[in-house]
Design a protein with these regions (language model features):
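TPR/TPR-like alpha-solenoid helical repeat scaffolds
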Residues: 70-90, 214-232, 293-318, 334, ...
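Short coil/linker segments at helix-helix boundaries
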Residues: 74, 79, 83-92, 236-280, ...
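Alpha-solenoid HEAT/Armadillo-like helical repeat scaffolds in large eukaryotic proteins
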Residues: 122-130, 154-162, 184-192, 218-222, ...
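Conserved acidic segment of CheY-like receiver
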Residues: 428-450, 462, 478
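Short hydrophobic/Thr-rich beta-strand motif most characteristic of the beta2 strand and flanking loop
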Residues: 453-461, 468
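Output/docking surface of receiver
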Residues: 510-548
């Protein structure tokens, strides 16, 4: 997600390279708006070099206002040293936005050119039929370099040719395309004649890419083995494994056979890995209709895509292709419901296994609607979720069980109400990802953040962390160790910064003593929100995360946390089962309704307290009732909760006085609710007389 007005800057040394753009950006490159945008861009770069970021941003905004076309941007990018754009991206602010906009527009032209059927057909004709080897070789190289996977449909048929030279030339061209050809080749098996099939299998075996193993097993008659391989790949795709989802930032096509022809279906990149996982699950299900994991994966991927769409910025959702994908995702609920309670429980378990708490929570939300009354044992996925280290999964499991409200106690049912109360108290709680290959330190930091009230999860490798971060784009902050064993911290920071799903997250680096040493200048390029010292208690990390995430109300993290709090409160209010001790939720509900809570959050918590409150809640409820600045609806709800808390009990003097005062409030609703609350308690005759006398209606 792009953030306008960032204060982060690249060092002056790095910006020196940007001055080369003053020469490279010729008037012919930016022809739109009669060269005005060209001049604005050059001026902006010059000002950026001088450290005048505010003035530079004004020029960059003028460039965006000129609304460059795809072709304008493509011409510019082709004629410019890419390092210029890299430094603009690092500079932040509107320099970063201009660079992202131009690169994105240019990329759209690149993609269209890579699919150009006329260009592909001409090169294939040369690669297959030219008499000279060097001509065939050059054409094959151009197919690989400029068209990649999109050349496969035109080449694959030649693998079944009766002419040995034709087959050899096709194999040569496809071999040069290499791993980019794997997905369309694997999808094509079964089309064409037997010779084409066998040559396709041999070619895929020669390339040796794991993504084709399931298709090869299927082609060789091993249905059971193929189904298992498809599911193994589905899990890797779902997790966003960087070594599996190849060309993740370039290619977003799902290959299938339709009416005997190999066709590509383009998808937005934010769902690409999930769509690959879903296709594998459908392939597995076609081989084994009884495969539970396949049905679970189909339900899970749909929910994961819905979550990912919800985490996009408004700007991203306005994109035509992304908006269309969002519209299509409206049908996910029907598919998820169709797998039934058992299928959704499997999907919830799978989401937890794959460390996608957001998708698992989305699945859990659908389970009560299809609940079939089955017995709940220790092996139930929701019961197992109650002890998950991921708070999202714990909270989702508790909320779902409350909504189900089983007729009898079940394993760990005594934990449910308190966990739900904790979920209610999690209003405006932020999501934090910890990346550290030191497993012990990662666990310590995760635990400390969770104890401090954050939702924290940990990854024990840089690549795993990037996959988790991109899975939903829902993390408010990423804490990464300065020392990783698989990739460098700079690779992690750069990838987080340039991906639209993660660019908005605050980035915090953990380093010994909080000192980045000689590398500080390099770190400064990535717009860090802070540096924290490593320690056994992780206090420094927690404090730095708190500082980085101190932001105003209304942001996406607060909205998500408030939604969770309201869902938990509503589940507690609606629960109706002897399996739960709902008063265990009281502490969390009181925290949810406390100072600083948004009105809808407080109202939901107070409505739940009207069902579960006891005398221990008097002090907090009294404070809400007595605060005149609280909205009348909140004070009324607090009075109703107080009525429950006082039922059959003697109110404290402070509570009695507060309710008596509230009976004289200007708002009739508050007066009425306060009267009902004071009447629910055990009053002395003297108190009863005082109420009647002091609040007499003349």
């Amino acid at each position: 997600m792009i953030r306008i007005g960032s204060n982060s800057r690249a060092p002056r040394r790095a910006l020196c390279l940007v001055t080369t753009a003053l020469v490279v950006f010729g008037g012919s490159a930016l022809a739109w708006a009669d060269g005005a945008a060209d001049e604005a861009l050059k001026a902006g770069i010059g000002l950026l070099k001088q450290g005048k970021s505010k003035e530079a941003d004004e020029k960059f905004r003028a460039v965006l206002a000129a609304d460059p076309s795809n072709q304008d941007a493509y011409s510019l990018v082709k004629d410019t040293d890419y390092r210029v754009f890299l430094e603009m991206l690092k500079a932040g602010g509107d320099a970063e936005q201009v660079a992202k906009r131009l690169l994105n527009l240019s990329n759209q032209v690149e993609v269209e050119k890579s699919k150009d059927p006329a260009a592909i057909a001409a090169l294939i004709d040369t690669a297959i039929n030219a008499k000279e080897l060097d001509q065939r070789d050059m054409a094959a190289r151009k197919l690989a370099g400029s068209h990649g996977q999109y050349a496969v449909p035109g080449l694959v048929g030649y693998l079944g040719s009766n002419d040995v030279d034709t087959r050899a030339n096709a194999i040569l061209a496809l071999t040069k395309i290499g791993s980019d050809a794997v997905l369309p080749l694997a999808a094509s098996i079964g089309t064409g004649n037997e010779m084409q099939k066998q040559n396709t299998i041999k070619l895929l075996q020669r390339i040796g890419d794991e993504r084709s193993e399931a298709a090869i097993a299927k082609a060789m008659g091993d249905k059971a083995g193929a189904a298992q391989k498809y599911m193994a790949m589905a899990k890797k795709y779902f997790h966003g494994d960087q070594m599996t989802v190849k060309a993740f930032d370039r290619s977003f096509s799902i290959w299938t056979v339709k009416d005997g022809a190999l066709v590509a279906r383009d998808v937005p990149r934010f769902v690409y890995n999930y769509e690959l996982a879903e296709q594998c699950a459908y392939d597995a299900l076609a081989l084994d209709p009884s495969m539970k994991d396949a049905r679970a994966m189909i339900a899970l991927t749909g929910c994961a895509e819905q979550v990912a769409f919800g985490n996009l910025s408004d700007e991203a959702r306005a994109n035509e292709g992304i908006a269309a994908q969002g519209k299509a995702l409206e049908g996910v609920g029907a598919i998820a419901g169709a797998v039934g309670a058992g299928g959704l429980l499997d999907a919830f378990r799978l989401g937890a296994e794959l460390k996608n708490g957001d998708a698992a929570a989305k699945v859990a939300d659908a389970i009560p609607g299809v609940w079939d009354g089955r017995a709940i044992g220790e092996d139930n996925a929701l019961v197992q979720g109650l002890t998950s280290e991921d708070n999202k999964i714990r909270y989702a499991a508790a909320i779902a069980l409350l909504r189900i409200s089983p007729a009898a106690a079940f394993p760990k049912s005594n934990m449910v109400a308190q966990i739900a109360g904790d979920a209610a108290a999690s209003r405006a709680v932020r999501q934090v990802l910890v990346i550290d290959t030191d497993t012990k330190n990662a666990m310590n930091v995760q635990r400390a953040l969770n104890q401090a009230g954050f939702h924290a999860v940990a990854a024990n490798a840089g690549t795993e962390g990037l996959s988790m971060a991109k899975a939903t784009g829902g993390f408010d902050a990423v804490v990464v160790s300065s020392k990783l064993s698989d990739i460098t911290v700079f690779q992690v920071l750069a990838d987080l910064g340039r991906d639209f799903r993660t660019s908005g997250a605050k980035k915090i680096v953990m380093a010994a003593g909080g000192d980045l040493g000689a590398s500080k200048a390099e770190y400064d390029k990535f717009g860090l929100s802070g540096v924290a010292p490593t320690s056994t208690d992780s206090v420094g990390v927690v404090n730095m995360v708190k500082e980085a995430l101190a932001s105003p109300a209304g942001d996406s993290g607060r909205v998500h946390a408030n939604w969770l709090s309201i869902a938990a409160s509503n589940a507690i209010a609606g629960a109706n089962s002897p399996a739960f001790n709902l008063r265990d939720a009281q502490k969390g509900l009181l925290a949810a309704a406390g100072p600083g809570a948004d009105p809808d959050v407080a109202l939901a918590a107070l409505n739940a307290l009207a069902k579960v409150a006891n005398g221990d809640a008097q002090s907090e409820l009294r404070g809400i009732i007595s605060t005149a600045s609280n909205p009348a609806a909140i004070r009324v709800a607090a009075c109703r909760a107080m009525a429950t808390a006082l039922r059959g009990q003697t109110p404290s003097k402070e509570t009695y006085d507060a309710l008596l005062d509230a009976m004289g409030d200007a708002d009739v609703g508050v007066r009425t609710a306060a009267g009902a609350a004071i009447g629910s308690g055990k009053l002395t005759p003297e108190q009863q007389a005082e109420v009647m006398t002091k609040r007499r209606v003349d």
